[in-house]
Each structure stands twice: as structure tokens, then as C-alpha cells.
């Protein structure tokens, strides 16, 4: 996932990962073993999957990007019978497991890396990057409305809310009004066209380490792909399919998604269902206990070797024998934004 209010001090496109981030910490928290079944819900370039397979565990690897799945076929041949690739949203990882292993099957671990794949960023035709000219697309699959659809069809107020909440863009209102005025004369269809229009509007301080369009591009991508909703549903799905003692490991890169993961594990620790405003109703048995203390970050050596790891945080939990808690998306405090399926029909 792109920058969501985390460490924006990195270079442009800093959310992109070219090498597996926190790989040693992921394996230590996940503890894969020979014969175990691990779900890699965000296959991407396959960095985590390869390392898990090397421990002797089997992997069900999920990615909604057909290009990533196709690229993974070579790894599938390298580990015959031990890697199953599934083209799917990671929010439906429970359905993917049922498809591969049978209904009701549980797994030993789930790992999620909430970062955009370098393969997607590096391909100009995918339209993720303002550093390369390409169609204003940003979809992780070929389905649904594109970023161009959002930019050219959404109301000004909705665009401003998307830029503000999903990108924490301080010029959200100004940029949205500029887009409304410009698109009436000429719709936005190319990445550099939008990036240049934003830079012309807000200017660029020579001291800034990121491009003025960074936060707008991140917000559009998160919106078009429903990345926050995907993360929320994936956490709930992982809770349903993990065996007692199974481990959920999540790597995030920015503060908004890290807060979602932190809130999930805190809620799943159980306790009273009441609050300081309402009387206690019942005690909720924990569905997860901590696998690590708080959030784990990169070592100084990894930061030196891979600056993109600088803002990475790992959180992990161990599934208890208790049943899943309430399957309620309101836990995550997701913003009310226009539905993308409505956008497609507009």
C-alpha cells in the first residue's frame, strides 16, 4: 500500500518494495515448519513465499494481479506440489483456502505485506507512477473503474475527501477544484498530465523530498483498489481460517493501515464488551494473543541496505482456541467514500 501518512521523508515512490522487507522478522514471527500450510495473501514478486517454501512449509499464494500469478509459475515448477497460486483478492483468502484445500480447512499461518509490488510500479502502462508517463489506471487487476474514472467523474467534494483521508494531502480542496475546472475542458487520461497539473498548482519546494503529486497518487490508488477495505476483510478472514496456535503476521508501511492492524489485535485480545459510556455486557474471550511485543521495525542495517524498509512495521498474533469475535467492519473506522461500483455506472 502506498504512503498513508507514515514516513513520507523517503524518496519519491518510496512505498515500492523491490526486496522482501523484514524477511527475517517475518519468518521468526510466522515460524513456518515442514508440512505446515501458510497463506501468503499478497504474493507480489514472491519474496516471502520463496523464503517460506525454503523452510519446508507449503504455501497458498494469493494475488489479484494476473501478471503476478503468471510470473509465479516458474516458482510453482521449482517447488512442485508445494505452491498453489490463486488469482484472487486477499480479502477472500478464506475462500481461496477452501478452493485449494477443501471447505472448513484451517491453516498454520497467514502473512500479509501491505505494500505495492515493484512489478506494478515499474510498468508504466499500469499507471501507478507519476515518474513514468502512462495511462491513468492504477488498478491492481483489470476489473473495475480506473483512476482516470475517479478523477474525471467524482464530485469535487468527494475527490477532496479522498485526497485528504487516504493521502493526508493538505492541499486536497485546492487540487480537487483544479481538477474539476481542468477536466471540463480536457479530461485527465495520463499520469504525467495529472502530476504536472498538481505541481503547477501547489509548487515544489526544493527542500521537499517527495513530489507534490505523491499523496494524491497514493490516495487514488488506495481508493480505486479499496485497499483499506481489503485489509479489514483480510484480517477478519485470517481469524476464521487459522488453526489454534496459527500465526497472523502483517507488515505495513504507513500509519493508517498500521493503526488498523493495531486496533484489530487490541480488539481481538478480548475483555469487556462495555465502555466508559456503556455498562459492561459480557466478557469477550480473546481470539488472538500477541506473537511479538508491539510493532517490530527494521534494523539499522536493513534501513541502510534498503531505504524503503524505513517505515515498515510488523505486528503479529497467535490464534487461540476461542471462536472468532464479531465479524464487524465498523471496528476499523473506515471512511464513507463513494462506492467504486457506482462510479463505474456513472
UniProtKB/Swiss-Prot annotation:
Keyword list, A-Z: Cytoplasm, Methyltransferase, rRNA processing, S-adenosyl-L-methionine, Transferase
Subcellular location: Cytoplasm
GO biological process, one term: rRNA base methylation
Alphabetized GO MF terms: rRNA (cytosine-N4-)-methyltransferase activity
Residue positions binding S-adenosyl-L-methionine: 46-48, 63, 90, 113, 120
GO cellular component: cytoplasm
Catalytic activity: cytidine(1402) in 16S rRNA + S-adenosyl-L-methionine = N(4)-methylcytidine(1402) in 16S rRNA + S-adenosyl-L-homocysteine + H(+)
Record keyword Transferase present: yes
This enzyme's EC code(s): 2.1.1.199
Sequence segments annotated as region (Disordered): 270-346
Function per UniProt: Specifically methylates the N4 position of cytidine in position 1402 (C1402) of 16S rRNA.
Protein family: Belongs to the methyltransferase superfamily. RsmH family.
Protein name, per record: Ribosomal RNA small subunit methyltransferase H
Gene behind this protein: rsmH
